Amino acid sequence: MVTWIRGEGLHRQAKEWAREHVKRLEEVGITPKLAIILLNDDPVELATQRRFASLKARDVREVGGEAEIYELHDVPPERRTKEALRLIESLNKRDDVTGVIIQKPVPPFVDERALFAALSPEKDVDALTPDNKKRLLDRFDLDNDVLPCTPAGILELFRMYGIEIRGKDVVVVGKGELVGKPLSVMLMQLDATVTVLHALSKEREPYVKRADIVISAVGRPPEIYRDNPWRLTGEMIKEGVVVVGVGGKVDPISGKWHFDVDEKSVAEKASYLTPNIGGVGLATRARVLKNLIRTSYQVARLVVSSRIVGP
């Protein structure tokens, strides 16, 4: 019988922890404020990103912080990078903004590298600036570092449920900058044997079939995409596997979510499985709160006093 890997516990703990630290930060004149930048004008991506952004903003406000969402998807393509860079420069300079998320993916005509190179590492909630990404190549501290939110949330779920990673064959489906790539590096740091599959991988099924852990981070459900769709089903996995579903998109017409993992068939064979609703999404939101608190302390040390001690 499958054990469901639920994110409610992590999310609840993170909110309680963040609420206490918001009070501490306010004592030194800092209120955590998250700025979220939306750049993608693709209807599916925009609908999905708006949903994610609203949930993150709600969490921040519920713990006593503030949140602002900036939508630049209506800016003409030829000007969008320039306008985004101007906004990032402004947010970097504002002492009241203590964390920034550039919601990914950005459209292909936007210079993504330039955006993350311009973002202050101290305010980088997703840990995607060049300086923050380097941390993953050495050692990382799951409890104290600002780390990519979804990968760190998944590792926290594994720890909470006692799921062993060391020495396990792990397949990560998807090599995106937000989840697949950083997660695969983090898993290798934890002594897993990692295989990364993507759209050009040949014969993906044999790798998936023999994996001890499968993490699906594609986000191309067949209900929405005809080009390179992906759906993980029960017939593709072995008995007793651990399955983590990350990818999901919102249909901009119906407003309905569609996911990477066929929950019903996979649950019949998996030993552990994240539910499509209430699993990785909540763990990610928990990590956003933790990272925002940490970036807020970094800002406090810069603008108030270097002697301020945070988590």
Curated annotation (Swiss-Prot):
Report the sequence similarity comment from the record.
Answer: Belongs to the tetrahydrofolate dehydrogenase/cyclohydrolase family.
- What's the stated role of this polypeptide? Catalyzes the oxidation of 5,10-methylenetetrahydrofolate to 5,10-methenyltetrahydrofolate and then the hydrolysis of 5,10-methenyltetrahydrofolate to 10-formyltetrahydrofolate.
**Organism, as annotated:** Pyrobaculum arsenaticum (strain DSM 13514 / JCM 11321 / PZ6)
- Which SUPFAM superfamilies does this UniProt record tie to the protein? Aminoacid dehydrogenase-like, N-terminal domain, NAD(P)-binding Rossmann-fold domains
Q: Which UniProt keywords apply?
A: Amino-acid biosynthesis, Histidine biosynthesis, Hydrolase, Methionine biosynthesis, Multifunctional enzyme, NADP, One-carbon metabolism, Oxidoreductase, Purine biosynthesis
Q: Kindly list the GO molecular function terms attached to this UniProt entry.
A: methenyltetrahydrofolate cyclohydrolase activity; methylenetetrahydrofolate dehydrogenase (NADP+) activity
Q: What reaction(s) does this enzyme catalyze? A: (6R)-5,10-methylene-5,6,7,8-tetrahydrofolate + NADP(+) = (6R)-5,10-methenyltetrahydrofolate + NADPH; (6R)-5,10-methenyltetrahydrofolate + H2O = (6R)-10-formyltetrahydrofolate + H(+)
Q: What is its EC number?
A: 1.5.1.5, 3.5.4.9
| PANTHER family linked | C-1-TETRAHYDROFOLATE SYNTHASE, CYTOPLASMIC (PTHR48099:SF5), C-1-TETRAHYDROFOLATE SYNTHASE, CYTOPLASMIC-RELATED (PTHR48099)
The protein here is known as Bifunctional protein FolD
Per its UniProt record, what Pfam families does this chain match? THF_DHG_CYH (PF00763), THF_DHG_CYH_C (PF02882)
Q: Which InterPro entries match?
A: Aminoacid_DH-like_N_sf (IPR046346), NAD(P)-bd_dom_sf (IPR036291), THF_DH/CycHdrlase (IPR000672), THF_DH/CycHdrlase_cat_dom (IPR020630), THF_DH/CycHdrlase_NAD-bd_dom (IPR020631)
Subunit structure and binding partners: Homodimer.
Q: Which Gene3D superfamilies match?
A: Leucine Dehydrogenase, chain A, domain 1, NAD(P)-binding Rossmann-like Domain
